[in-house]
């Protein structure tokens, strides 16, 4: 992958294939190897990252157009901060679930460990809109981790 990303023509061809095939796995691989992406193709990959809804992974927001910047801002949390103390950005699926729950729609969510379900739980606890929230976790370790993480919202 590194070899492909460092070569302009190969990198551009990869971006084209990702776009045509809607290949999320390949795009994730590009994100993981961002430091190797040819400088002149980075804006193309930034557009792809944005179009796939991977907003938290946008590295070079200055190359995005106004509409893309607006979509990126729309996916930001009002309550949670990221490591640089800016507002945390949800990816497309997280924002979709956040909106459903905000509109009082009941959901059952099954997603991989890395999806960010715990982040959504933290978002709703941080809002302090509810006095009682029930959180069901599959293991004692995860229950304890969640309890420690949410303790900062205790009044």
Model-derived features: positions:
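N-terminal helicase ATP-binding lobe
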Residues: 1-155
């Amino acid at each position: 992958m590194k070899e492909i990303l460092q070569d302009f023509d190969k990198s551009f061809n990869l971006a084209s294939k990702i776009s045509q095939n809607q290949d999320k796995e390949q795009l994730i691989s590009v994100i993981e190897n961002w430091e190797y992406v040819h400088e002149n193709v980075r804006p193309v990959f930034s557009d792809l990252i944005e179009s796939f809804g991977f907003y938290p992974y946008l590295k070079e927001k200055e190359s995005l157009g106004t509409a893309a910047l607006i979509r990126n801002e729309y996916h930001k949390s009002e309550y949670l901060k990221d490591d640089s103390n800016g507002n945390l950005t949800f990816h497309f699926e997280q924002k979709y679930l956040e909106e459903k729950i905000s509109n009082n729609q009941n959901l059952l969510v099954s997603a991989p460990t890395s999806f960010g379900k715990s982040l959504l739980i933290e978002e709703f606890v941080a809002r302090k809109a509810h006095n009682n929230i029930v959180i069901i976790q599959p293991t004692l370790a995860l229950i304890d981790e969640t309890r420690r993480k949410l303790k900062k919202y205790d009044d």
